[in-house]
Regions:
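Core structural elements
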Residues: 142-152, 170, 200-202, 250-262, ...
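C-terminal or mid-to-C-terminal helical accessory/interaction module adjacent to the motor/catalytic core
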Residues: 116-198, 248
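Basic, low-complexity terminal or inter-domain segments flanking catalytic cores
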Residues: 2-8, 19, 154, 187, ...
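Short acidic, hydrophobic short linear motifs in intrinsically disordered regions
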Residues: 242-245, 254-267, 294-303, 459-471
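Intrinsically disordered, low-complexity regulatory segments
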Residues: 1-143, 152, 214-215, 219, ...
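Metal- or metallocofactor-binding catalytic centers and their adjacent structured scaffolds
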Residues: 220-256, 443
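Conserved short loop/turn motifs at secondary-structure junctions
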Residues: 5, 85-86, 162-166, 247-256, ...
Length: 783
C-alpha cells in the first residue's frame, strides 16, 4: 500500500514511470496511463456540430481498470503531478486525466521534461505549472477537424468507390503529393544530351588526367552526336595546353542537430528504418532503457520537435567530450543554430541527454535498433559542434583552340566533423575526378583519346519515405508529430505502395485522389492544409479561438459535401485492376489483382475464357518479432491463414495470431490478436516484456498447433493447419449430432418454438452492431 502522503505522478508509459520513479524516490508514486484514457468514441461522429462543435468525449473501452487504479491512487495521495509528454498531445492527455480524476484547478500540477535526467526531473517537480489550455485547444481543434473530415468523407468513398476506404485532412494531401510526382514522371519527355571527355598526357613528363568538355569558350551544351562530332573535327590533330590552374581551400560545415523530420529522413537513409519505426525506437530511448549499474536511463531528449535550440549545459558538455575524445583541434567554439521560420521553440533539438554515455559504452544494454539510432543521434549532435572539414581543391583548365576542357580534384586537408559523421543524401553523389598532376599554366599537353557518351535527362525521382517527410515539412503539411503516422497510413490504406524504397500510387490511390481533386479542392490543397496548420499554431499561441477555426472550416467543407453528394448521385467509380508482373500459366497474359471476401488473389484478365487464378502473398502490418523483417500472410493447402516472416526458414517465425498495426507501449514490438470469434484486444507476444500476455490469457483456449519453433518451414505450417481443420470438422460433426435431440424436442414443443422465433429480431442486434463496427470511418490520425 502506498503511503497516504505520497505524491502521485502520472506519465504515459511504464518505462517512463520506471525512469522517473528512480529519480524521485519514496515520497512519490509514479503510475502510467498507457496513453489516452478519454477520447471521441469511434461508433459515432461524437461532435455536436449544431452546438458549437462540442466534442462528446468518453472513457476508452479497455481502459476501465487503469482509470479505476489511477482514481484509487489519487484518493490516497498528496499532490497529483501530470507529467505527460511536452507537446499538444501530452497536454491533452493531462487535461483528460484532470477531468477523469476530478482534480480541482488549484490542485493541478503540470510538469514536463525535455529530457528524463535526475536534474531535469527534480527541477521540473519543484516548478509545476497549470495546464496550458491553449495547447489543449490546439489539440482539440486538430482532433475534431480530423474526425469531421474522416467521418463525413469516408462514407462517400464507400458509396462511390468501395467499402473500407478512408480520407483525411492530411493523409489525402500526402497521397496527392505522391500522385502528383507520378504524373510528373509520366508526363516527362527525356531530352538528349552528350558529354565529351579527353584523356590528356603531359608533354615529356609523367602524369595524365581526364578533363570534361566545357565550351568554346563559353559554356555549351552538346545536344546531339552532330554537336560532338563538330567539336572532335575541330580538335583533330591539334595541340592542347594548360590555360589555367587554380588552387583553393574549401570548407564544409556540419549539419545541425536532429529535429523530428531530419531524424526520420536520416534514419531512413542510413538505417533503413521507416519513420514510424524511428519514432517508436526514439520514444524508448527518451523514456528510458535499462543500463548496467545505472538502472533505467533516458538517453535522448524529447523527439517531437522542430527546434534547433541547444541548452548551454549541453553545449558545454559537447565541447568537453570533443576535446577529450578527439583533441582541441576538433573544437573551436559552441555552435548555435538559428531556428527555421515558423518553428516552435518550446523544446530543444534532439540530442543525447548525457554525451558522456558514448554509444559503445551502452551498446550491450540496447537492442540493435536502439543502439544504431542512439549512435546516429549521438554522432550527429557531437558532429554539429565540431570544427569544419577542410579540403584542398585544384581546378585545371585546358584548351585546344577556342574549345575549353576542365578538370577538378579535391583532397581532404582536415577531417573536422567528418571524423565521426557525414549526412546522407537522397540523390546520387557526383563522381569525383582522380588526382591531378602538378601542372603549370602554359604547359603543353597531348590528347591520348576521346570518350563521347550519350545521355538523356531523367524524370524527377519518386519520393522515398525520407524525401516525402522533407516535402511535407517544406510545404507545411502536418507537424513533426504527424509525419510518421501519415506516411504509414497512406501505405496501410493501400493508396501508396513502397517498392525498393520508392513510393508510388496504387490504382486505388489515384482514383481516390481524382475524386478528391474534383470535388474537394480545398481538402486536397497543399496551401489550404498548410494554412490550417498555421491556424492551429495560432490557437496554441492564444491568438485564435479553436471553435472559430472549426466554424470557418466547416462552412466551406459542408457545402463541398452537399455539392459532391448531388454531383455524384448516380456515379460509381471503378478502380482499374492492378496489373502484376506474373504471367498466366495458361494463356501468358499478365495476371491482375482481384479481391474476394476471402482476400486478394491473382487472376487472368481473360476471364471467363481463361479461369486461371493464383494465391497472392499479403504483407501484414508490423514487423517480425525475431528479426524485424516484414510479416506475410500465407495460406495452407486447406485454406487456413497463418503469418510468417518474409525470410521464411532463414528466420523461422510463424504464428496463427494476427499481426496488428499497434506496437507494444513497453517494448515497442508488434502486437498480435487472436483470429476468429472470442478474440480479445491486441496483446504483446514478447516473453521478455513486462506487458507480455501468457498463452492461456489471450481470449480463448486454442487447439494444439505447430509452435513457432517447429514452424521453420511452410510444410510444417500446412500440416498443422490441416490437423487443425480436421479437428474443427470433427468438432463440428459432434456438435451437429449432439444438436439433433434438442432440435427434435424443440420441434415437438410448437408454442415454445413460436416464442423463440418471435425473439429472432432481438438476437440479430449484436450481429448488426458488429457489422456496423467494421465499416466505421477512420480519423486522419487515430490513436
Amino acid at each position: 500500500m502506498p503511503n497516504a502522503k505520497q505524491n502521485l505522478v502520472i506519465v504515459e508509459s511504464p518505462s517512463k514511470a520506471k525512469t522517473i520513479g528512480k529519480y524521485l524516490g519514496p515520497d512519490y508514486q509514479v503510475k502510467a496511463s498507457m496513453g489516452h484514457l478519454r477520447d471521441l468514441p469511434k461508433s459515432t461522429l461524437s461532435v455536436d456540430i449544431e452546438h458549437d462543435f462540442e466534442p462528446e468525449y468518453q472513457p476508452l473501452k479497455g481502459k476501465e481498470d487503469i482509470i479505476a487504479d489511477l482514481r484509487k491512487a489519487a484518493k490516497g495521495s498528496g499532490r497529483i503531478y501530470l507529467a505527460t509528454d511536452p507537446d499538444r498531445e501530452g497536454e491533452a492527455i493531462s487535461w483528460h486525466l484532470k477531468y477523469l480524476l476530478n482534480i480541482p484547478d488549484n490542485e493541478t500540477y503540470r510538469v514536463t521534461f525535455n529530457e528524463i535526467t535526475r536534474n531535469v526531473v527534480q527541477e521540473s517537480i519543484q516548478h509545476p505549472r497549470p495546464i496550458d489550455q491553449n495547447l489543449v485547444d490546439a489539440q482539440q481543434a486538430r482532433r475534431v477537424l480530423d474526425r469531421i473530415v474522416g467521418y463525413q468523407l469516408s462514407p462517400l468513398l464507400w458509396k462511390k468507390i468501395r467499402k473500407g476506404l478512408s480520407a483525411g485532412r492530411v493523409q489525402s494531401v500526402a497521397t496527392r503529393l505522391v500522385v502528383d510526382r507520378e504524373n510528373e514522371i509520366r508526363a516527362f519527355v527525356p531530352q538528349e544530351y552528350w558529354t565529351l571527355d579527353v584523356n590528356l598526357n603531359r608533354a615529356g613528363k609523367p602524369g595524365s588526367f581526364t578533363a570534361h568538355y566545357y565550351g568554346d569558350p563559353q559554356k555549351r551544351e552538346l545536344t546531339s552526336e552532330q554537336d560532338v562530332q563538330s567539336v572532335l573535327d575541330a580538335l583533330e590533330g591539334q595541340p592542347f595546353s594548360v590555360t589555367g590552374v587554380k588552387r583553393s581551400e574549401k570548407k564544409r560545415t556540419p549539419a545541425p542537430p536532429f529535429i523530428t523530420s531530419t531524424l526520420q529522413q536520416e534514419a531512413s537513409r542510413k538505417l533503413n528504418m521507416t519513420p514510424r519505426r524511428t519514432m517508436m525506437i526514439a520514444q524508448q530511448l527518451y523514456e528510458g532503457v535499462e543500463i548496467s549499474g545505472e538502472g533505467s536511463v533516458g538517453l535522448i531528449t524529447y523527439m517531437r520537435t522542430d527546434s534547433l535550440r541547444i541548452s548551454e549545459e549541453a553545449l558545454a558538455a559537447a565541447g568537453d567530450a570533443i576535446r577529450s575524445r578527439y583533441g582541441a583541434a576538433y573544437y573551436a567554439e559552441p555552435r548555435r543554430y538559428k531556428p527555421k521560420s515558423g518553428a516552435q521553440d518550446a523544446h530543444e533539438a534532439i540530442r543525447p541527454s548525457n554525451v558522456a554515455l558514448y554509444p559503445e559504452a551502452v551498446e550491450h544494454d540496447l537492442t540493435k535498433e536502439q543502439y544504431r539510432l542512439y549512435k546516429l543521434i549521438w554522432s550527429r549532435f557531437i558532429a554539429s559542434q565540431m570544427t569544419n572539414a577542410l579540403y584542398d581543391v585544384t581546378a585545371i583548365e585546358a584548351a585546344c583552340g577556342s574549345h575549353v576542357f576542365r578538370a577538378t580534384h579535391q583532397s581532404m586537408k582536415f577531417s573536422g566533423f567528418t571524423a565521426i559523421y557525414e549526412e546522407g543524401r537522397d540523390d546520387e553523389q557526383e563522381k569525383l575526378d582522380s588526382p591531378l598532376p602538378d601542372l603549370a599554366p602554359g604547359e603543353a599537353l597531348t590528347a591520348a583519346g576521346f570518350d563521347k557518351q550519350q545521355h538523356f535527362t531523367q524524370p524527377p525521382a519518386r519520393y522515398t519515405e525520407a524525401s516525402l517527410v522533407r516535402a511535407m515539412e517544406e510545404k507545411g503539411v502536418g507537424r513533426p508529430s504527424t509525419y510518421a503516422a501519415i506516411i504509414a497510413t497512406i501505405q496501410d490504406r493501400e493508396y501508396v505502395i513502397k517498392t525498393d524504397k520508392k513510393l508510388s500510387p496504387t490504382k486505388l490511390g489515384e482514383v481516390v485522389n481524382g475524386l478528391m481533386m474534383d470535388r474537394f479542392p480545398n481538402i486536397i490543397s497543399v496551401e489550404f492544409t498548410a494554412d490550417m496548420e498555421k491556424q492551429l499554431d495560432q490557437v496554441e499561441a492564444g491568438q485564435r479561438r479553436w471553435k472559430s477555426v472549426l466554424e470557418e472550416f466547416y462552412t466551406g467543407f459542408h457545402q463541398e459535401m452537399v455539392d459532391a453528394e448531388e454531383a455524384l448521385k448516380d456515379t460509381r467509380l471503378k478502380v482499374p485492376d492492378e496489373v502484376s508482373d506474373e504471367k498466366c500459366e495458361i494463356c501468358g497474359r499478365n495476371l491482375v489483382v482481384k479481391t474476394s471476401r476471402f482476400g486478394k488473389f491473382l487472376a487472368c484478365p481473360g476471364y471467363p475464357d481463361c479461369k486461371f487464378t493464383k494465391p497472392i502473398t499479403e504483407k501484414m502490418p508490423g514487423r517480425c518479432p525475431k528479426c524485424g523483417s516484414a510479416i506475410l500472410k500465407r495460406k495452407s493447402k486447406r485454406g487456413y491463414a497463418y503469418y510468417a516472416c518474409e525470410r521464411g526458414a532463414a528466420c523461422g517465425f510463424m504464428t496463427w495470431d494476427v499481426p496488428t498495426d499497434q506496437d507494444c507501449p513497453v517494448c515497442g514490438q508488434t502486437m498480435f490478436k487472436r483470429s476468429g470469434k472470442g478474440a480479445m484486444k491486441p496483446f504483446c507476444a514478447n516473453p521478455e516484456c513486462s506487458n507480455f500476455l501468457p498463452e492461456d490469457k489471450r481470449g480463448y483456449r486454442r487447439k494444439s498447433t505447430a509452435s513457432g519453433e517447429a514452424a521453420t518451414a511452410e510444410s510444417n505450417a500446412e500440416a498443422a493447419a490441416e490437423a487443425a481443420q480436421k479437428q474443427a470438422e470433427e468438432k463440428k460433426a459432434a456438435k451437429k449430432a449432439a444438436a439433433k435431440k434438442p432440435a427434435e424436442k424443440a420441434a415437438a414443443k410448437k408454442p415454445a418454438a413460436k416464442k423463440t422465433a418471435a425473439k429472432k429480431p432481438a438476437a440479430k442486434k449484436p450481429a448488426a452492431k458488429k457489422a456496423a463496427k467494421k465499416t466505421e470511418p477512420e480519423d486522419d490520425l487515430p490513436f
